[in-house]
Regions:
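Catalytic machinery of carbohydrate-active enzymes
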Residues: 1-319
Length: 319
């Protein structure tokens, strides 16, 4: 059996789709999988069992689909985890016996993980028993990484791909890092030009205070990003793809929310995560930039609040 899967575009969505992917894998144990999608989503599932990875060419996706029609020949099942119209066209170009399309308007108030699971349950008329986040990577170490100086590791993730509205201030991240710098090594994570600027700003603030810090922005693959996050002792993050990676590995995480719905994108089943947010009338606006121009949902959320939540988390963690 040959199964074609159009993966979600964003890293966080791809992580949240992982239980649904493994439900398909469990139901069709001997199937061959073609995983198609963005650079980051395909990299996340590069080691998925019995799979062929194809990176989507956004500039000429339909021409690419026509080529894939010849290359892949007949496909038994196709699943689109994207609700975009382009995804529907691609699946109709391919020689597919049965096609299933994710509808983002169904189960609108449910967590994104459950939305994806319901999509597969309804498509295949089955009941999903696998609901844990899961990635196919085999990590190099079996126990938390301890550095030579004996310090634990604090990871900072100041970026968020959706837009600037989701990003806590770089100086706030730096203040949190300064508070834990005596007990923790500091690692900064990020990707892309916009996040590079944020990461560099945090790095410079900490270096000026003679704090030892490593800036890993744009210096990791998806696999090494997962590995580095997995062995953090504490992770401070915006609502983002790396936040969902930390949930896979049950990392102690303080997740900072502003314009997005934490009921739908919170760290899934991570009992070692705590959410920090305000309760403003304008929240959640679900906008890429603040429509009111003040960005109070993030600016009024001060570093001391996050520091206190992190301390409580370290005291009361399930790990």
């Amino acid at each position: 059996m040959k199964i074609f899967i159009h993966l979600p575009t964003w890293l966080g969505d791809a992580v949240m789709a992982s239980p649904a992917l493994y439900v398909i894998k469990e139901h069709f144990k001997n199937a061959q999988f073609i995983l198609y999608g963005s650079l980051v989503s395909t990299a996340l599932f590069k080691e998925f069992p019995n799979s062929k990875i194809i990176i989507e060419n956004k500039q000429s996706r339909y021409k690419q689909a026509l080529s894939l029609r010849k290359e892949l020949d007949k496909i038994d099942l196709s699943f689109a985890f994207r609700s975009a119209f382009s995804s529907k066209i691609i699946l109709h170009i391919l020689k597919t016996k049965q096609r299933y399309f994710f509808d983002k308007n169904k189960h609108k108030e449910e967590h994104q993980v459950l939305k994806y699971l319901y999509f597969i349950e309804n498509s295949l008329h089955i009941k999903a028993h696998l609901k844990d986040l899961k990635l196919p990577f085999k990590l190099k170490f079996q126990s938390p990484l301890v550095l030579k100086n004996g310090k634990k590791i604090l990871g900072l993730n100041p970026g968020a791909s959706f837009g600037s509205a989701k990003r806590w201030d770089a100086s706030y991240f730096a203040k949190v890092a300064l508070n834990f710098s005596q007990s923790h090594e500091i690692l900064i994570f990020g990707a892309g030009k916009a996040e590079q600027e944020l990461c560099n700003e945090i790095y410079q603030i900490l270096k000026e205070q003679n704090i030892k810090v490593k800036n890993l922005c744009n210096k990791t693959t998806i696999k090494t990003l997962c590995q580095n996050i997995a062995f953090c002792d504490l992770f401070i993050t915006n609502d983002s793809g790396p936040m969902h990676i930390s949930a896979v590995y049950k990392v102690k995480t303080v997740a900072i929310f502003g314009p997005t719905k934490f009921t739908q994108t919170s760290p899934w089943q991570n009992e070692n995560a705590t959410l920090v947010h305000l309760n403003l009338a304008c929240m959640p606006c679900m906008q890429k930039t603040c429509p009111l121009k003040h960005h109070k949902c993030m600016k009024d959320l001060k570093p001391q609040r996050v520091i206190e939540e992190a301390r409580n988390l370290l005291k009361n963690s399930h790990l």
